[in-house]
Design a protein with these regions (language model features):
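Small beta-barrel nucleic-acid-binding modules, primarily SNase/OB-fold domains
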Residues: 2-115
């Protein structure tokens, strides 16, 4: 009888593991050179890039660069660092590169590190 329940339990666990989907956060919109709208199929978040300070004269160039790096529906990991005025401050790491977008920003010369 105990083996029967064990087999049933294994079948149920396998079924739920196979059928469950994991939804990653994804880029919905690049709002400005340091602010993104990110969604996870359930909620949306306004996210400010952590540790990035963008010069106002590079705003337009920075937005265009960021849109190329993070097109709509790009899957990302978030590493929150805090919040300011209800806006999440976080490191944003695209799945395909595993490098924080702020590091790329700084390497391109479009931002300075403020951390």
């Amino acid at each position: 009888m105990n083996k029967f329940f064990t087999k049933i339990l294994i079948v149920l666990i396998t079924f739920f593991c196979i059928s469950s989907k994991v939804y990653a956060a994804e880029i919905l919109q690049v709002t400005s050179s340091s602010v993104l709208l990110i969604g996870d199929h359930n909620r949306t978040y306004t996210v400010k890039l952590a540790c990035a300070e963008i010069s106002p004269d590079l705003e337009e160039k920075s937005v265009n660069w960021l849109k190329k790096q993070l097109p709509r529906h790009t899957k990302v990991n978030l590493k929150p660092k805090g919040s300011v005025d209800g806006i999440l401050v976080s490191k944003v790491i695209p799945f395909d590169s595993n490098i924080d977008i702020t590091e790329k920003y700084i390497n391109e010369g479009l931002a300075t590190n403020k951390c």
